[in-house]
Amino acid sequence: LEAESRCLSWTELEFLVRDKSRRPLLERARLMGLPVSIPYDAEVPIKWQDDLFTANRTNHSPDDLKVLDFSSLWAGPLCSHLLLNLGCKVVKVESRNRGDISGSATPRLFSVLNKDKELLIVDFQNEAELESLRQMICDADIVIEGSRPRAFEALGIDRRSIRSQQTSAQHHNQLWLSLTAYGRFGAAAAWVGFGDDVAASAGVLDRSSDGGYGFVGDAIADPLAGLQAALTVKECLTRNLRGLLDFSLFRAARIALETVERLYDSPLAPLKKVRTRC
């Protein structure tokens, strides 16, 4: 914002933002790794780059499937929680130095989503532990990745690196779910996003008759992504498909919005009063 003071009130912040062009401000915020968005952003890529193929073995019962879940917060843990309820064995992988912050921020939600999963704590700075983890990834039936791709690439546990260590059978029978804010390819792969701002970017917003905007629910793109990702994984298992699912919070929010508007054959009606939240 190029402000002289680092301590701004909300009133001062609103005044500074009001005089700025949206797109340059958004681009600068993204360079700084901030979760910022423009409502109904038409420049966000909406082409999903899934890479799916038919598995080279017959379908297995969910009871026979092992899920490695590297995600945190809400979307990924909700997805693996639903897969657990289907019968899959789920192992939640956490960093020894940086665990899932939702455990302290929202302990009740964390307990509901993760209480019946096996917990694996890994020191990502320890090469021996990393190598053991790589072998676990090779053997897993489903991998849930909840970080931007470059984080896994830096550790050598990304899908391409793991592929070089897998047998053909392991690779062709593994489903890799990539859960990101805006997708894993192109410039959008580096963008930071959370449930509220990504939903706004997709157009999932409260709208008042005077043109104002407000959030819908609480970080609504997160549960939408978790639910839709679990349904998509289940569909892949039913159809014996494996490979890569490029799933994002933005994709889930857009699908939900377009589905509701298609069902009602019109854009969502504006609300009488916008609910705002800071």
What do the predicted segments below correspond to?
Residues 38-39:
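Charged, structured surface patches that assemble and position nucleic-acid processing machinery
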Residues 1-7:
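N-terminal segments that mediate ammonia production and transfer
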Residues 10-33, 42-278:
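N-terminal helix-loop segment corresponding to the beta1-alpha1 unit
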